[in-house]
């Protein structure tokens, strides 16, 4: 797992970390609810979030909350996991790795309503890119809505380039750009 890091913004403490498929089940529900609002049918979904954390990677920014005494272990499906109610979801990125182990695909990047425009996705994206490069990934790909100017700006700033327009990628008239980062 990647090493967690923390930062402070407006007197709040935020942590960037990789999710654990056994210990972070409560956050799975938050991610699915959030992504359903943001991406609709394109969200990671309740059946896919756990395999993403187990066989891919899911990184989050969480806001650390004040009442730490509410941490407790909870039994679920004969597995014990930590119910971390001392944090709330801020941003999330899901990643898949290709069969060619030098390629990774960023499935989703999003920030919870109320936290947009504060730099959380930018910090998380930088953390994830550093992590991928340390894993000897040489190509990172993602798709983005053709009209999503904020996301395109973030990705271009990180070194991504638009490779092609994918017409009807997610259905009729739902076009996306394929963007790629290639290690130099």
Where are these regions (language model features)?
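Conserved glycine-rich acetyl-CoA-binding loop
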Residues: 112-126, 145-153, 157
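Conserved GNAT acetyl-CoA-binding A-motif
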Residues: 132-143
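Eukaryotic N-terminal low-complexity, Ser/Thr- and Lys/Arg-rich leader segments
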Residues: 1-11
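C-terminal "cap" of GNAT-fold acetyltransferases
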Residues: 5-7, 145-149, 158, 165-184
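Structural motif
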Residues: 135, 157-158
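Short aromatic/hydrophobic contact patches that present stacked aromatics
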Residues: 108-110, 141-143, 178
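Acetyl-CoA-dependent GNAT
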Residues: 11-114, 125-127, 131
């Amino acid at each position: 797992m990647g090493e967690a890091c923390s930062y402070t913004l407006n007197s709040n403490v935020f942590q960037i970390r990789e999710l654990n498929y056994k210990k972070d089940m409560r956050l799975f529900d938050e991610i699915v609810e959030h992504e359903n609002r943001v991406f609709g049918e394109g969200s990671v979904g309740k059946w896919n979030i756990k395999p993403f954390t187990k066989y891919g990677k899911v990184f989050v920014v969480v806001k650390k909350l004040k009442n730490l005494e509410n941490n407790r272990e909870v039994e679920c499906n004969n597995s014990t996991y930590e119910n971390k109610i001392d944090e709330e979801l801020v941003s999330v990125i899901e990643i898949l790795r290709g069969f060619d182990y030098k390629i990774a695909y960023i499935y989703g990047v999003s920030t919870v309503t109320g936290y947009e425009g504060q730099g959380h996705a930018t910090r998380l994206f930088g953390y994830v890119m550093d992590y991928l490069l340390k894993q000897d990934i040489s190509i990172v790909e993602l798709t983005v809505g053709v009209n999503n100017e904020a996301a395109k700006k973030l990705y271009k700033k990180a070194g991504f380039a638009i490779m092609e327009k994918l017409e009807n990628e997610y259905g009729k008239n739902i076009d996306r750009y394929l963007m790629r980062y290639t290690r130099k």
